[in-house]
Amino acid sequence: MNKKTIWITGGSTGIGKSLAIKFANEGWNVAISARREELLNQISEKYENISSFPLDVTDKLKCKEIFNQIRNKYESIDICFFSTG
């Protein structure tokens, strides 16, 4: 059985970060996005099943690109949680 995947925007701090860690601890694949790449990398380095995808959600083309990158990496996205701004 494949692991489920969640994509969390605003995943570098606050609620987004807390949710990312919670889902990672439950065994999910977690993709996190935010503008601050250094914070994303700090989180993804601590958790094997968290991957970071830097993103400014105001850039519609980049959002689509990141969505496709995540889907290609994990085959599907089961939940999208938008915790931005």
Regions found by a protein language model. Give the residues of each.
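Aromatic pocket-lining residues of Rossmann-like dinucleotide-binding sites
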Residues: 23
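Conserved NAD(P)H cofactor-binding loop of Rossmann-fold oxidoreductase domains
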Residues: 83-85
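Conserved glycine-rich cofactor-binding loop
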Residues: 10-14
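A conserved hydrophobic alpha-helix of the Rossmann-fold in NAD(P)-dependent oxidoreductases
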Residues: 40, 63-70
